[in-house]
Amino acid sequence: MKAVITVIGRDTVGVIARISGVCSELDINIEDVTQSIMQQMFCMIMLVDLSRCSVPQEEMRRRFAEVGETMRMQVNVTRQEVFDAMHRV
């Protein structure tokens, strides 16, 4: 299963490292990533493969939420099908 991880918040050092670190800890493969900084706001979208994730989805979401809280950023994990449906015109 694929998912989209979005990260939004005030730019700070180590955002990509911390999010990718959680991915590594949970055996989540990062397939694509894009990020930009708009007026000191950091925005990142990661496409990830959850097929080898080592924990249940609830635990995975909790781990990303915790990292987001410590960085004071919003981190969301959305299944790719849901993300695609939400952004289809």
Q: Model-flagged regions — what are they?
A:
Residues M1-V89:
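A conserved regulatory-domain signal marking ACT and ACT-like small-molecule sensing domains
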